[in-house]
């Protein structure tokens, strides 16, 4: 009978020693599993934060670009207005007074045609016929005195020749009005001042 007791006592220590080994294995396995877990909430919040900052920066860039485009036409308009005002002021100082319309510009080397009549009516008829017959410019009408009136035209030589002939023919049809008709193909430059109209009133 003493042998079974010894066997039971020898078996019990073996069982008690196996338990601590299992608990140690469990302790070793659990920390390994815990270290493998990942904090997903932190990464998700960081991603959402980066997306929100990206959206905000994109929106800020768009608003700044729109403001720049809106300000550009205004600045251009201001520059153009300033440039126009500056050019106007600069050109305003350089503007020359226009020449008198009553005094035509005499060009040297252009033919001169003259018709002198007795009375005003033949002179008007001659001037009308000359300007209608050819491309000439009526430059002067002078009261000579004693009822004589002189009309002068300028233009190319052929045009002045045709105009004076037409004026003389028209003047002869109005009574005995024609006194003289003459053409100078190229008046001298010293004669030019004498051709300017004097705007003298009718003389008795």
Curated annotation (Swiss-Prot):
CDD domains: BMC_CsoS1 (cd07058)
Cell location: Carboxysome
Protein name according to UniProt: Probable carboxysome shell protein CsoS1E
Region called Disordered, residue ranges: 1-102
Predominant location category: other
Protein family membership: Belongs to the bacterial microcompartments protein family.
Annotated coiled-coil segments of the chain: none
Quaternary data: Homohexamer.
Family annotation (SUPFAM superfamilies): CcmK-like (SSF143414)
Keywords associated with the record: Bacterial microcompartment, Carbon dioxide fixation, Carboxysome, Photosynthesis
One Pfam family per UniProt: BMC
Domain BMC: 111-196
Role according to the record: A probable carboxysomal shell protein found only in Prochlorococcus and Synechococcus strains that grow in low light.
Gene Ontology biological process: carbon fixation; photosynthesis
This protein's GO CC annotations: carboxysome
GO MF term list: structural constituent of carboxysome shell
InterPro entries: Bact_microcomp_CS, BMC_dom, BMC_shell, CcmK-like_sf, CcmK/CsoS1_BMC
Top-level taxon: Bacteria
Organism: Prochlorococcus marinus (strain MIT 9313)
Extent of Low complexity compositional bias: 1-14, 41-84, 92-102
């Amino acid at each position: 009978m003493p042998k079974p007791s010894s066997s039971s006592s020898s078996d019990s220590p073996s069982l008690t020693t196996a338990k601590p080994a299992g608990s140690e294995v469990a302790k070793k396995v659990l920390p390994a599993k815990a270290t493998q877990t990942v904090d997903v909430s932190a990464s998700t919040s960081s991603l959402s934060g980066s997306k929100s900052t990206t959206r905000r920066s994109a929106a800020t860039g768009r608003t700044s670009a729109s403001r720049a485009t809106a300000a550009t036409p205004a600045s251009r308009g201001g520059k153009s207005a300033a440039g126009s005002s500056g050019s106007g002021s600069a050109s305003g100082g350089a503007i020359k007074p226009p020449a008198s319309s009553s005094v035509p510009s005499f060009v040297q080397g252009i033919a001169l045609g003259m018709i002198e009549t007795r009375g005003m009516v033949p002179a008007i008829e001659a001037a009308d016929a000359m300007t209608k017959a050819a491309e000439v410019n009526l430059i002067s009408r002078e009261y000579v005195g004693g009822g004589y009136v002189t009309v002068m035209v300028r233009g190319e030589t052929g045009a002045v020749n045709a105009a004076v002939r037409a004026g003389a023919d028209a003047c002869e049809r109005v009574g005995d009005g024609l006194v003289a008709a003459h053409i100078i193909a190229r008046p001298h430059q010293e004669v030019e001042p004498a051709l300017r109209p004097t705007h003298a009133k009718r003389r008795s």
